[in-house]
Regions:
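Glycine-rich acetyl-CoA-binding "A-motif" of GNAT/NAT acetyltransferases
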Residues: 99
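Hot-dog-fold acyl-thioester-processing enzymes
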Residues: 1-55, 102-104, 110-185
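Conserved small/polar residues in nucleotide/adenosyl-binding loops
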Residues: 225-227
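Hydrophobic beta-sheet segments that form the core/acyl-binding groove
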Residues: 60-95, 189-222
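Generic intrinsically disordered, low-complexity segments enriched for polar/acidic and small residues
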Residues: 7, 87, 107, 170, ...
Length: 227
């Protein structure tokens, strides 16, 4: 297990003074990337070898979002490698071990030079010893969405949406999805499926609907987010 200590900063809180939903995902992503840095397999080093990890799905459950100034720790560990896929858990908790959030994430190993997934290198798997999966509900990577969607926004991809893979970072989709939810809607859990990465100059057409108390946000032809 790898752990990273953090504190809620003002730049990451929402209107209620809580760590934002997308900022929670970013904190988990940061922990994962620090893990890679500290075992000598950083994202930038992988790119030099024409390799990268891309996320294909998130399932995040919130127990409580921490408030401005509150300290917290994010833990992460992989629990499975198979073929091109890797699965990784996250746990966010207070210094007193109160669970704030936990997550499952699915990733695939990628060759940027070909634009195709590729088998995980043995050295990559060896750098991340697996541990038992977290005790949570595990769902399918794919999210089923109703068809009665309403177009609510068009977003042009600009530079500050991109990460080092030159794609829109997964946290940006989460942020944009939350922005089109009812203003007082509290996200207690979400699932996100990423199908195709948006790039600089693309236009994302955001459509929404709700059904049985669940909100669905779809980035047309790019990714599907279920909140």
């Amino acid at each position: 297990m790898y752990s990273y200590h953090d504190r809620v900063s003002y730049s990451r809180i929402d209107k209620d003074g809580l760590l934002g939903v997308s900022d929670t995902v970013n904190a988990m992503q940061d922990c994962c990337l620090f893990h890679s840095e500290d075992v000598g397999h950083s994202a930038l080093d992988l790119l030099k070898k024409n390799r990268a990890w891309l996320v294909s799905a998130w399932h995040v459950v919130f127990k409580r979002r921490p408030v401005m100034g509150e300290r917290f720790t994010v833990h992460t560990w992989p629990y499975q490698f198979k073929g091109i896929f890797g699965c990784r858990n996250f746990l966010m908790e207070t210094p007193d071990k109160e669970v704030l959030a936990y997550a499952d994430s699915r990733w695939f190993y990628f060759d940027p030079s070909t634009g195709q997934p590729t088998k995980i290198d043995d050295s990559e798997k060896a750098a991340y010893p697996t541990e038992p999966a977290y005790d949570m509900e595990y769902s399918s990577r794919k999210v089923k969405c109703p068809e009665n969607l309403t177009l609510v926004e068009e977003v042009d991809v600009c530079q500050n949406y991109l990460d080092t893979n030159h794609h829109v970072n997964n946290g940006q989709y989460i942020r944009l999805a939350v922005n089109v939810l009812p203003i007082d809607f509290e996200v207690s859990e979400f699932r996100a499926e990423f199908r195709l990465a948006a790039k600089m100059g693309d236009t994302m057409y955001i459509r929404t609907t709700s059904e049985n108390g669940k909100f669905y946000v779809v980035f047309t032809d790019l990714s599907l987010i279920h909140i």
